[in-house]
Swiss-Prot record:
One of its GO terms (molecular function) is 4 iron, 4 sulfur cluster binding. Its main location: cytoplasm. This is tRNA-2-methylthio-N(6)-dimethylallyladenosine synthase. The gene is miaB. Its EC number is 2.8.4.3. Its cofactor is [4Fe-4S] cluster. It is found in: Cytoplasm. It is an enzyme of class 2 (transferase). NCBIfam families: miaB-methiolase, MiaB/RimO family radical SAM methylthiotransferase. It comes from Rhodopseudomonas palustris (strain TIE-1). It catalyses: N(6)-dimethylallyladenosine(37) in tRNA + (sulfur carrier)-SH + AH2 + 2 S-adenosyl-L-methionine = 2-methylsulfanyl-N(6)-dimethylallyladenosine(37) in tRNA + (sulfur carrier)-H + 5'-deoxyadenosine + L-methionine + A + S-adenosyl-L-homocysteine + 2 H(+). The keyword Signal does not apply. Catalyzes the methylthiolation of N6-(dimethylallyl)adenosine (i(6)A), leading to the formation of 2-methylthio-N6-(dimethylallyl)adenosine (ms(2)i(6)A) at position 37 in tRNAs that read codons beginning with uridine.
Length: 463
C-alpha cells in the first residue's frame, strides 16, 4: 500500500474560499491525499485565490516565486511537488498564469474543483492543465461528500454553500465574471448536507453565497424557496442550534427573511449587509441600484423584526470621483446606523470591470486619510458594542480549547470571541456566560450556571 500523498491548501479572501478549500480536500481524499500544515512537506500545493483584495494577482505571483524554491528543494530530495492555482484569480487570469508562471502545473476555476483529480493526472502526462470554463453540470452534484472523520475534525461550526454567483454587476466587482451568474442549490441537497453535518457533531451552520439572500432554490414542493423559507426548514434539523448567512445585498431582503429573524431563535441576530458608500452619487456610480435611504429603510425593517439584531458591513473609500461631500455622507451613514463591526478598504481597480476605466481617481494620500477616519469611527462603534456586554449574561456556543490551560473559547450570537475557564466537556454546548471584562476584541467571563443543556436539547426545544 502506497503512503498517502500530502496536500497543502493556502486560501485567501472570503468564506466561500474556506468552504471551497474543504471541498477540494474532499475531492482529493479518494486519490490518497491527506492535509498537511507544512508546505515544505506537500506533494501538492493549491493556492486558493481571491480577486477582491488589492493587488490580488501580484500576491499570487509572489507566492508562486516562494513555492518555486520549495519545489526545487523537494526535487533535490527526489520528491515531486505539484502546484495548482485555484479560485477567482485563476478564473480571471488562467492563461496569463500559465504563460507567466512555468512552476504552475494546474490552473482551475471555482466551477471545476470536482475535476481536480483528472486535471492533476493530465498535468502529469502533458506537463500542465488549465480549466476555467463554466461547465454545464452542477459541481455540487459531483463533488464527493466529506467523510465523517473529516467533518468531526473541522469542529462544531461549518459553512454550507447554498448560492453562488452574482447578477448585480457592481462596477467595481469581478465576482460576476469569476463566479458566473446566480445559481441556487436545491433545498433537498442543502438539507442533506446539513443533516450530515449535524449527525457528525456540527452545531452551527453558516449558509454562504456571493449574494446569499437572492437564494431561490428548487423546493421539494416544486416551487422556488426563499432564503427565509430555507432557514425555517434547516432550523428543524436536530442538533443545529445556530444558523447564520452571508453575504447579503440590501435589494434582496424580503419579508420571508425578516419573518425568520422574528420567529427563529436559531437564526442569529447578526447580519452582514454591505452598503459600500453613504453617498447616493457614488452608489449610482457603483451600480448598487439602491440609495442610502433605501439601505436605512432595510436596516429599520430588520430592527422592527428583531430588537436584538446587530449589523456589520463593507465600505469602499476613494471610489473614482468620490468627493469630501461623498465621504462625509458615508461617515454620516455609519454614525447613524451604528455597527458592531465593519470592513473598510481603499478602492483599487480590477481589470475588466467598468470602474477600472473611470478616470477621476482619488489621490492615494486622500484615500489613506479617509480610510483612517472611517476605521476610527468603526473601531469606536465596535468597542462600544463590546463594552456593552460587560456585566451582562450572554449565550455562548463553545467551540474549542483556548491557548491557556483550562481555557475554553466560544462565540456569542454576534461572533464575539468569549473565553472562560471550564472543562472541555462544555465544547459543543450553548451556555450562559457572565461577562466581566474585555481583552482586545474578546469577552472574558465565567459560566453563569453550573447546569446546562447540550446543543441537541436546545435545538429540539427551539431555545
Amino acid at each position: 500500500m502506497s503512503p498517502p500523498r500530502k496536500l497543502h491548501i493556502k486560501s485567501y479572501g472570503c468564506q466561500m474560499n474556506v468552504y471551497d478549500a474543504q471541498r477540494m480536500v474532499d475531492a482529493l481524499a479518494p486519490e490518497g491525499f491527506v492535509e498537511t500544515a507544512n508546505v515544505d512537506d506537500a506533494d501538492l500545493v493549491i493556492l486558493n485565490t481571491c480577486h477582491i483584495r488589492e493587488k490580488a494577482s501580484e500576491k499570487v505571483y509572489s507566492e508562486l516565486g516562494r513555492l518555486r524554491v520549495a519545489r526545487d528543494e523537494a526535487a533535490n530530495h527526489g520528491r515531486r511537488m505539484q502546484i495548482a492555482v485555484a479560485g477567482c484569480v485563476a478564473q480571471a487570469e488562467g492563461e496569463e498564469i500559465i504563460r507567466r508562471a512555468p512552476v504552475v502545473d494546474v490552473v482551475v476555476g471555482p466551477q471545476s474543483y470536482h475535476n481536480l483529480p483528472q486535471l492533476l493526472a493530465k498535468a502529469e502526462q502533458h506537463g500542465r492543465a488549465l480549466e476555467t470554463e463554466f461547465p454545464i453540470e452542477d459541481k455540487f452534484g459531483v463533488l464527493p461528500q466529506p467523510a465523517p472523520d473529516a467533518i468531526r475534525a473541522r469542529g462544531i461550526s461549518a459553512f454550507v454553500t447554498v448560492q453562488e454567483g452574482c447578477d448585480k454587476f457592481c462596477t467595481f466587482c469581478v465576482v460576476p465574471y469569476t463566479r458566473g451568474a446566480e445559481m441556487s442549490r436545491p433545498v433537498v441537497a442543502i438539507v442533506e448536507d446539513v443533516k450530515r453535518l449535524a449527525e457528525n457533531g456540527v452545531r452551527e451552520v453558516t449558509l454562504i453565497g456571493q449574494n446569499v439572500n437572492a437564494y431561490h432554490g428548487d423546493g421539494p414542493d416544486g416551487r422556488a424557496w426563499s432564503l427565509g423559507r430555507l432557514v425555517r426548514r434547516l432550523a428543524e434539523i436536530p442538533g443545529i442550534v445556530r444558523l447564520r448567512y452571508s453575504t447579503s445585498h440590501p435589494n434582496d431582503v424580503d419579508d420571508d427573511l425578516l419573518a425568520a429573524h422574528r420567529d427563529l431563535p436559531a437564526l442569529m441576530p447578526f447580519v452582514h449587509l454591505p452598503v459600500q458608500s453613504g453617498s447616493d452619487r457614488i452608489l449610482a456610480a457603483m451600480n448598487r441600484k439602491h440609495t442610502a435611504d433605501d439601505y436605512r429603510r432595510v436596516i429599520d425593517r430588520f430592527r422592527s423584526a428583531s430588537e436584538t439584531i446587530a449589523f456589520s458591513s463593507d465600505f469602499i473609500v476613494g471610489f473614482p470621483g468620490e468627493t469630501e461631500r461623498d465621504f462625509s455622507a458615508t461617515l454620516a451613514l455609519v454614525a447613524q446606523i451604528g455597527y458592531a463591526g465593519a470592513y473598510s478598504f481603499k478602492y483599487s481597480p480590477r481589470p475588466g470591470t467598468p470602474a477600472a476605466d473611470m478616470v477621476e481617481m482619488v489621490p492615494a494620500a486622500v484615500m489613506d486619510e479617509r480610510l483612517e477616519q472611517l476605521q476610527q469611527l468603526i473601531d469606536q462603534q465596535q468597542s462600544a458594542f463590546n463594552k456593552a456586554a460587560i456585566g451582562r449574561t450572554v449565550e455562548v456556543l463553545f467551540e474549542r480549547a483556548g491557548r491557556k490551560p483550562g481555557q475554553i473559547v466560544g462565540r456569542t450570537a454576534y461572533l464575539q470571541p468569549a473565553h472562560v475557564m471550564a472543562p472541555d466537556s462544555i465544547i459543543g454546548k450553548v451556555l450562559p456566560v457572565r461577562v466581566d471584562s474585555l481583552e482586545r476584541y474578546s469577552l472574558l467571563g465565567e459560566l453563569a450556571s453550573a447546569t446546562s443543556r447540550p446543543a441537541d436539547a436546545m435545538a429540539a426545544t427551539g431555545a
